[in-house]
Amino acid sequence: MNNARPIRRALLSVSDKTGILEFAQALHAQGVELLSTGGTARLLADNGVPVIEVSDYTGHPEIMDGRVKTLHPKVHGGILGRRGIDEIVMEQNAIKPIDLVAVNLYPFAETVAKEGCTLADAVENIDIGGPTMVRSTAKNHKDTTIVVNAKDYDRVIQEMQANQGSTTLETRFDLAIAAFEHTAAYDGMIANYFGTMVPAHSQDECHQDSKFPRTYNTQLVKKQDLRYGENSHQSAAFYVDLNIDEASVASATQLQGKALSYNNIADTDAALECVKEFSEPACVIVKHANPCGVAIGKDLLEAYNRAYQTDPTSAFGGIIAFNGELDAETASAIVERQFVEVIIAPVVSQAARDVVAAKANVRLLECGQWASKTRSLDYKRVNGGLLIQDRDQGMVEMSDIKVVTKRQPTEAEMKDLMFCWKVAKFVKSNAIVYAKDSMTIGVGAGQMSRVYSAKVAGIKAADENLEVVGSVMASDAFFPFRDGIDAAAAAGISCIIQPGGSIRDEEIIAAADEHGMAMVFTGMRHFRH
């Protein structure tokens, strides 16, 4: 192969030693001469792998406590030397070609994440020689092979075994892309860290000025190209975080069905994040990013049946999320009753898979169990900029709630209030949710005035012949006027949960008292746009 390049000499210098010994042994078995530094060289030598210290190769010792090890012309000339062009210069300067470099970088992210990390700790974990070698090797990918991830060690060895000790241009180019992605992410982390800090009195100390850096750097990996975006004339792709550490649509495994669309992904995310709020068996049905039916049951089948009952019309072509293992009985109820785009659950039983398999186009996803929530950010693109905020993970406990009316909620009402409040958090503002016995009765979403959202919730309930009298109501934000309270009372709502905080709170409370309703304040708003 004319684009194949033989590996005769390799430089190995890694912070994470995972798999490096086996990689070195395999390279040695292929007749590759090994150069290395510091701890990596000691590991190889201690395990009987012949290795040349870089300082012996360059004739220059490591200096400044290891800060300068590989920054030498005999190293970078060997990496950057163009085969067929630079041989004379290399020979004149006693530079030998280095055909492969395996490097991973100082653990900067892990260091700054540790409690008590000082500026000095952070600075000493900024790798200099490593990124320089990575970039040099990736730049000269026409002739040299760069490996920055231990998962690629086997790939390189297998290719060498299949190509008489050589790697192909296709592989070198792909590894070069991974290398540039790696150094970009690394530099981005460093810039983000320093961009939040201001120096203190000591040159070795600093403190956080803001949790948001002055230049924001992040890196996402393309999971899949999408057929189109929100609309058919828009191109789209799905990118995910580098390290996903919680159950999500981004980390879910698709077990069957057509490829996920842009809207499928957005709606599935909304459904899954909502159902995660519940500890009892729960089902959430979403249409156009809004819950149209949510319920708790003694099991998932009952939860699904009750959620569907809220709004069967909107449930058609919807997304269904569960917070427990999907069983065959529940799966049968879904596929026999309605057209569904996506079903997602932490676990899907084999029997449930067999049931859904009869509907080949249904997208069935398994996301894994979730534990505690992890801190993360939300992004909203605006023309010319990006809004960044903490993800809304706030949720009040019953002990946080303040009863503001003369009438106290009953125990049953309080349970429904907490259920209703969790649902309202995931409904587009202005959001009004009616609920009774841990089941949504009506959902009013996205209206420009809060009173109209209340009217929509009432209309939805009436359309499905659901009894509103005795239900509770949740509002994602405060009521600016008493008209929303009057509308709720007219519909038969017995109890209201809302953040409070309006300049007319006293008037709102008086209206609730006038109607004999109970009302509680959470002190926390849940706008969703």
UniProtKB/Swiss-Prot annotation:
- Which pathway does the protein contribute to? Purine metabolism; IMP biosynthesis via de novo pathway; 5-formamido-1-(5-phospho-D-ribosyl)imidazole-4-carboxamide from 5-amino-1-(5-phospho-D-ribosyl)imidazole-4-carboxamide (10-formyl THF route): step 1/1; Purine metabolism; IMP biosynthesis via de novo pathway; IMP from 5-formamido-1-(5-phospho-D-ribosyl)imidazole-4-carboxamide: step 1/1
At the top level, the lineage of the source is Bacteria
Q: Which CDD domains match?
A: IMPCH
Q: Where is the signal peptide?
A: none
E.C. number(s) listed in UniProt:
2.1.2.3, 3.5.4.10
Which reaction is catalysed here? (6R)-10-formyltetrahydrofolate + 5-amino-1-(5-phospho-beta-D-ribosyl)imidazole-4-carboxamide = 5-formamido-1-(5-phospho-D-ribosyl)imidazole-4-carboxamide + (6S)-5,6,7,8-tetrahydrofolate; IMP + H2O = 5-formamido-1-(5-phospho-D-ribosyl)imidazole-4-carboxamide
Q: Does Translocase count among this protein's keywords?
A: no
Q: Which UniProt keywords apply?
A: Hydrolase, Multifunctional enzyme, Purine biosynthesis, Transferase
The cross-references to InterPro entries, in alphabetical order and at most eight, read: AICAR_Tfase_dup_dom_sf, Cytidine_deaminase-like, MGS-like_dom, MGS-like_dom_sf, PurH-like
Q: What is known of its domains?
A: The IMP cyclohydrolase activity resides in the N-terminal region.
Query: This protein is called what?
Result: Bifunctional purine biosynthesis protein PurH
Native organism: Shewanella loihica (strain ATCC BAA-1088 / PV-4)
